Amino acid sequence: MPKTNNQKKVNTFKNILKKQMKKTLTLLASLVLFFVASAQSNQSTNSAVNPAKDWKFGIALWTFHTFSFAESLDKVDSAGLKYIEPNNFTKTLPELNDSSLMQLSPSGIQKLKSLIEQRGLKCESVYLAGGKDIDAWKKQFEAAKQLGVQFVTTEPPLDMWDSIDSLAGIYGIKVAIHEHWKGMSHYWNPDTTLLAIKGHPNFGVCADLGHWPKSGIKPLDAIKKLSGHIIAIHLKDIAAYNNPKLVDVPVGTGVIDFPAIFRELKKQGFKGPIYIERDATDQPSNLPSVIQEVKYYNEQVSKL
């Protein structure tokens, strides 16, 4: 019996439906494979990072800037920390005429380096205040090279990105762009930092967690935006958002969600220094709060 027009329409519809089903199943299978691969990739990244081992926990010596260099090292030792980040403007040692790092001769820098090594400490970075011309920057990079650091933490002028990136390449030292708050730093907004990094292979980020809230920026959001570029962390807390006049509070007592930040850093595969840094000057010293922060950090990292 010949097929009626209705039967032909039904068969045509069935064929179309089968084709659509095949396409849908193929698409679903592809999506499943994609999500499985993504999950495996994330798991691989996470498992590849051991925070207790791969995060170099230490302190920025600015924390003890009211003390001599030797006294600062004593306090670092008392806190049980290993990695330090000095800066180029704090007085060094009486036997070096209390000169700043940038004023020292090569032999003076070697003496400072030997003192650090004798204490069993490691110095992989230094904070540079920078300068107005390339000669000033070159002098500071030269001192950083003699000190044996891997990167410098600094805030390069907007019109010197190219020249400072070139200097970094010449000296084999990375530049970790640091930020202060709005009105004090060009880099208060992570978008500016990303602009600086673009086209400058020697640039990365030193994320100061306690400064972003002063500009109304959530540190976790900034960390996510800067993923893949973070060289180091300045560990710092603050009591409230949108108040640039506030000084920091001990880590874990303010508004910053550190557990979420630590999870995000692990997810990103971050491996590098995490430096405690206090701007506040507790009396008689910041050492008690630093010890408190060390305990808090170790507790949080043990949960990752």
Enumerate the language-model features and the residues they cover.
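Short beta-strands and strand-loop turn motifs
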Residues: 86-88, 123-126, 174-179, 206-207, ...
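Catalytic-core regions built around general acid/base machinery
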Residues: 101-118, 163-170, 261-264
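Active-site acidic/histidine proton-transfer and metal-coordination neighborhood
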Residues: 115-204, 213-216, 287-288
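Histidine-acidic metal/acid-base catalytic patches
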Residues: 39-61, 65-83, 145-148, 166, ...
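Bacterial Sec-dependent N-terminal signal peptides
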Residues: 1-45
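Glycine-rich, proline-tolerant flexible connector loops at the mouths of alpha/beta enzymes
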Residues: 85-111
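Active-site-proximal loop/turn and secondary-structure-junction residues that shape catalytic pockets
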Residues: 63-65, 88-90, 129-132, 157-160, ...
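Metal-dependent catalytic neighborhoods of phosphoester/phosphodiester hydrolases
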Residues: 95-99, 103, 134-138, 286
